[in-house]
Curated annotation (Swiss-Prot):
Protein's recorded name: Large ribosomal subunit protein bL9
Cystine connections: none
Species per Swiss-Prot/TrEMBL record: Bradyrhizobium diazoefficiens (strain JCM 10833 / BCRC 13528 / IAM 13628 / NBRC 14792 / USDA 110)
Task of the protein: Binds to the 23S rRNA.
Keyword rRNA processing: no
Family listed: Belongs to the bacterial ribosomal protein bL9 family.
Coiled coil: none
UniProt region (Disordered), positions on chain: 155-201
GO cellular component, one term: cytosolic large ribosomal subunit
Alphabetically ordered keywords of this record: Ribonucleoprotein, Ribosomal protein, RNA-binding, rRNA-binding
Keyword Ribosomal protein: yes
Pfam families named among the record's database cross-references: Ribosomal_L9_C (PF03948), Ribosomal_L9_N (PF01281)
Sample GO molecular function, one term: rRNA binding
Length: 201
């Protein structure tokens, strides 16, 4: 289906462009959310008539979005999750979790604004793009950790995996030492040296 974009759409095109997309994507996203019109002769004429108004509204919303962008640019959001010693999460961190974390910090964002290709499944720092406006994007950091203390250590640049490896190595060393130590064992008695025979006088 060919559509006329009413705003810039990431990886698709700019306002006013006529692009060809899959029917399902057009119906369920672009048309439903008012981001495009079917590229019919009537709608082309309709777009020409509303172009100036669309551009004015776009400039106004872009200005507001820029203010939000200034507030969140470079922001570090901390999300606490349970994970294995190897740093693999028991679950994942998704778009909803990031939106909730922002809300806890007094910032309201919509899920479509968070550009996350796949759920986060590991401990560490992850860079995420937030599209506060079709023409305004910023990068933020999501630090996923098992505790607030661990999150602070990750943000200081400490190698959490090395700490875990050292702890595991120490545990293995203690276990290995236990295998060779028998607390019930007793030292063998040392036989006394035989007494020297008296020399016959």
């Amino acid at each position: 289906m060919e559509v006329i974009l009413l705003e810039r759409v990431n990886k698709l095109g700019q306002m006013g462009e006529v692009v060809k997309v899959r029917d399902g994507y057009a119906r369920n996203f672009l048309l439903k959310r008012g981001k495009a019109l079917r590229a019919t002769a009537d709608n082309r004429a309709k777009y020409d008539g509303m172009k100036a108004d669309l551009e004015a509204r776009n400039l106004a919303s872009k200005a507001e979005a820029s203010k939000v962008a200034e507030k969140i640019q470079g922001k570090n959001i901390i999300v606490i999750r349970q994970a294995s010693e190897a740093g693999q999460l028991f679950g994942s961190v998704n778009v909803r979790d990031i939106v909730v974390a922002f809300e806890a910090d007094g910032i309201s964002l919509a899920r479509p604004q968070i550009q996350l290709d796949a759920p986060i499944k590991t401990i560490g720092k992850h860079t995420i793009t937030v599209a506060v406006h079709p023409e305004v994007e910023v990068e933020i950091t999501v630090t996923v950790a098992r505790s607030q203390d661990e999150a602070e250590r990750i943000n200081r640049g400490e190698d959490i995996s090395t700490r875990n490896e050292d702890r595991d190595a120490a545990a293995e060393a203690i276990a290995a030492a236990g295998e060779f130590f028998d607390p019930e064992a007793q030292h063998d008695d040392v036989e006394p040296a035989p007494a020297a025979e008296e020399t016959e006088k």
